[in-house]
Each structure stands twice: as C-alpha cells, then as structure tokens.
Design a protein with these regions (language model features):
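Catalytic phosphate/metal-binding cores of nucleic-acid and nucleotide-processing enzymes, i.e., regions
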Residues: 1-106
Length: 106
C-alpha cells in the first residue's frame, strides 16, 4: 500500500475513533495538492495522524507544530494491532490540565 493511501486510512481510522469517543470529527481535506489538517472537529487542537510501525516522534511533533497555526499541536499515532496514543509537548499538556483542574473549557 502506498504511503498516501496508508495515511488516508490512518486519518479515517482516527476520525472514527474520535466519533466513538463522542466527538464529531472527520478527515480533513487536501486542496490543490496542499496539505490541510489530517482531521477536523477538535477546536483548538491540531492533529497530525501517523499510522506507522516506526515513528520518529520528534519529526512528527515538529510537523504538527509547523502546521498548527496557533492551535495545540498533537500527534495521534498507532501501530498495527495497538491502541491509539496521543503525543504532545509537556507545556501543552500542563496547559490543558490546568484548564481541566480549574473547571474551565479549553
């Protein structure tokens, strides 16, 4: 399977997982060959989806940060036969945790 098809499949799989968690998320779109967001529907969060067996997480986070445009960059990733994981910068995790702890919506 080529990397574009595998990427699309990963994005669709993660969007489905998000919907199962109660969030109205769908796969993003590409326009004129330009990359858009991998998935949309999580306000304030920029999601980079990686569905690979070997992942350079620092490269993936750098890509998400580069494309985030003011949103919190995360990487949603998983291997075959494994659960979805979310990786994000520690400072962003603490920002979300403080908001949750204070009872605020992020």
């Amino acid at each position: 399977m080529n990397s574009k098809r595998k990427g699309k499949r990963g994005e669709l799989d993660f969007a489905k997982f998000c919907r199962e968690q109660g969030y109205d998320v769908r796969r993003g779109q590409q326009y004129n060959g330009l990359e858009g967001e991998d998935v949309v529907g999580l306000p304030g969060i920029h999601v980079e989806v990686k569905r690979v067996e070997r992942l350079n997480i620092y490269d993936a986070i750098a890509q998400s940060k580069r494309d985030a445009r003011g949103k919190i960059p995360i990487v949603a990733h998983r291997r075959n036969n494994c659960e979805w994981l979310i990786t994000m910068r520690a400072e962003d995790w603490f920002k979300l945790y403080r908001e949750w702890e204070a009872g605020n919506n992020v």
